[in-house]
Regions:
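Helix N-cap at the start of a conserved alpha-helix in ABC-type nucleotide-binding domains
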Residues: 2-4
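Switch/coupling loops of ABC transporter nucleotide-binding domains
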Residues: 21
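A short, surface-exposed alpha-helical micro-motif characterized by mixed small hydrophobic
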Residues: 33-35
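Conserved catalytic/dimer-interface elements of ABC ATPase nucleotide-binding domains
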Residues: 41
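Conserved beta-strand-loop-alpha-helix hinge in the C-terminal portion
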Residues: 47-74
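Flexible loop/N-cap segments at domain edges
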Residues: 115
Length: 115
């Protein structure tokens, strides 16, 4: 349940911030972790495909077409825009971060699907 997952990860993050506790989460739905993740280890076929700060590991995942769908949707959009438009966008943790970058770069979102 998405609301339960969001609440759980927020609680775990609050514990981390309050007590400085290291938290290790195994999660396939990265969208839930996006606001909180700091570092990430990505496994592919039992091998480490990326191990770094989230902002450094995510582009490595994006380059691998098998791993790309596992990225949070917001970062799939971000990295796709950076690739297509040769931009260096911020480290989006929320839709508000994305909208702020859109405003900064004059990107206008239109309804429908971009191909």
């Amino acid at each position: 349940d998405p609301d339960g997952a969001q609440s759980l990860y927020k609680l775990v993050y609050d514990i981390h911030k309050r007590y400085g506790t290291t938290i290790v989460a195994v999660e396939h739905r990265m969208d839930y972790l996006l606001p909180y993740v700091t570092d990430m280890i990505v496994l592919k076929e039992g091998e480490v495909a990326a191990a770094d700060a989230f902002e450094a590991a995510a582009p490595k995942m994006y380059e691998d077409k098998a791993l790309r769908p596992l990225l949070p949707a917001l970062w799939q959009i971000k990295l796709g825009l950076e690739e297509k438009l040769s931009l260096d966008l911020g480290d989006w943790r929320s839709e508000q971060d994305a909208l702020a970058d859109f405003k900064t770069y004059g990107i206008v979102a239109k309804e429908g699907r971009a191909d």
